[in-house]
A protein has these predicted regions:
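Bacterial N-terminal signal peptides that target proteins for export
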Residues: 1-14
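Bacterial N-terminal signal peptides
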Residues: 12-22
Length: 179
């Protein structure tokens, strides 16, 4: 019991420390990615055996491809401390249904036309869908929306989380805005 509390406090401290990290640049920032990765730690009912993180983009849109590449590079940043068990890969939106064993999906920039598909994928596969576009979560299409500029905001779509069967710890839910 004591170890669990220490783990939660450590995670909470790390998320709060992320607020002090400088911005990476581009549509999705390093800070957005750091916070998003730590959101995964607050999922209390994560399915076992899932270690993939799909960075979903639209290969037909240059800005989406560039943002996806920046997200992938930021996941390799030594300051991120990504768990060795989590493996990130770029996945074109047209190939998302073929991706398997995903723990989370990170949505690249310029994906608004695909929000319905992402929401349906999250519900069907019980996968956490993260976006740096807060409107994705506000619209109930992404599970979590994260923005770090001009100030940090984390929004959880209660509707999408429930439909996807995703539950978050109470400590996390106290730190975020739920829609």
């Amino acid at each position: 019991m004591g170890r669990a509390i220490i783990d939660r406090v450590t995670r909470l401290t790390f998320v709060l420390a992320c607020l002090l990290v400088p911005v990476w640049g581009g549509a999705t920032t390093l800070k957005d990615v750091k916070i998003g990765i730590h959101v995964i730690d607050f999922v209390t009912n994560a399915p076992s055996g899932r270690a993939g993180i799909a960075i979903v983009y639209d290969a037909r849109i240059k800005e989406s491809v560039e943002d996806a590449q920046l997200i992938l590079e930021s996941l390799s940043s030594p300051s991120l401390h990504l768990a060795a068990s989590l493996k990130a890969a770029l996945v074109d939106i047209r190939d998302l249904d073929e991706a398997s064993a995903l723990r989370a999906v990170i949505v690249a920039d310029r994906m608004k036309p695909h929000y319905d598909s992402l929401a349906e994928f999250g519900r069907r596969t019980r996968t956490l869908v993260l976006s740096s576009d807060l409107d994705c979560a506000r619209a109930g299409k992404c599970t979590v929306g994260i923005a770090s500029n001009p100030r940090v905001e984390v929004i959880v779509s209660s509707q999408q989380a429930q439909a996807s069967g995703i539950q978050f710890s109470e400590a996390f839910r106290m730190m975020v805005t739920e829609y």
